[in-house]
Curated annotation (Swiss-Prot):
Active site: 52
Protein name (Swiss-Prot/TrEMBL): tRNA pseudouridine synthase A
Organism of this sequence: Burkholderia pseudomallei (strain K96243)
Entry's EC annotation: 5.4.99.12
GO biological processes: tRNA pseudouridine synthesis
Keyword set includes tRNA processing: yes
Source taxonomy: Bacteria, Pseudomonadati, Pseudomonadota, Betaproteobacteria, Burkholderiales
């Protein structure tokens, strides 16, 4: 039995999230149908992190076990031949049994692209979040500083979250304006369900001047979801990177397919 890892990219706007559903309109369903067509047998995938409806994947990683012996490029080309244009396998790599797409990962990175303009842009539909009023970037940075570190993030988890512990280590929140956009980078050991979107909702509320920067510390301390802002829209959220120990030599995510990749590359915590 061989363990194969795949790197996946997908347009989240085209699917009802990652996790398989009876209606079959999820990324996992599309991927497993295509793998079955290519391999002529059912293959079950395990994913690094489940994404919600509308959330995009640039650096998603899955693994599956199989008796089939195929070349790496064969898994890529063969599976892609049966996938819709909104999802594609980027790479395939044999892995040792010690590799696990979810449990071997030690960090995840999400980016959020936010369009700030009085009028929404149809060209950005499904690609970026949108607010119509200016935001105070310095206030959002001050607020974000209260969240970095190891904390109980219960105030930012959804009621449907199945995580065993609400304690996560948030390594970085980077915020950088770029013309009519503000880009956010969230890097942590793991995230709770809706955690990034709930953090975004609170940061935007601070940026709009509805709350002072210190409010985020109060929300965090409360551990109460009702104290935080509403969950922000999913459209601008991208799972960009999943980190694994060097021994697995997981290929890096290809971010060049998004127009903001050069801006994201500069989001290193000093901005």
């Amino acid at each position: 039995m061989m363990r194969i890892a795949l790197g996946i990219q997908y347009d989240g706007a085209a699917f009802c999230g990652w996790q398989s559903q009876p209606h079959g309109k999820t990324v996992q369903d599309a991927l497993e149908r295509s793998l079955a067509e290519f391999a002529q047998t059912s293959l079950h995938t395990t994913v690094a992190g489940r994404t919600d409806t509308g959330v995009h994947g640039l650096g998603q990683v899955v693994h599956f076990d199989t008796d089939l012996d195929r070349a790496d490029f064969s898994w890529v080309r063969g599976t892609n031949a049966f996938l819709p244009p909104t999802v594609a396998v980027q790479w395939a790599k044999p892995m040792p049994d010690t590799f696990h797409a979810r449990f071997a990962a030690f960090e995840r990175t999400y980016y959020y692209a936010l369009y700030v303009h009085p009028v929404r842009s149809p060209m950005l539909a499904g690609r970026a979040g949108w607010v119509h009023t200016p935001l105070d970037v310095d206030a959002m940075r001050e607020a974000a500083a209260h969240l970095v570190g190891e904390h109980d993030f219960s105030a930012f988890r959804s009621s449907e979250c199945q995580a065993k512990s609400p304690v996560k280590h948030l390594y970085q929140i980077g915020i950088r304006p770029d013309g009519d956009f503000i880009h956010f980078r969230f890097r942590a050991n793991a995230f709770l369900h809706h955690m990034v979107r709930n953090l975004m909702g609170c940061l935007v509320a601070v940026g709009r001047g509805r709350y002072p920067s210190s409010w985020l510390a109060e929300v965090l301390e409360s551990r109460d979801r009702d104290c935080a802002a509403p969950t922000f829209m999913p459209e601008g959220l991208y799972l960009a990177h999943v980190g694994y120990p060097a021994e697995f030599a997981v290929p890096p995510a290809q971010l060049g397919s998004v127009p903001w990749s050069s801006v994201w590359a500069d989001l290193d915590g000093r901005t």
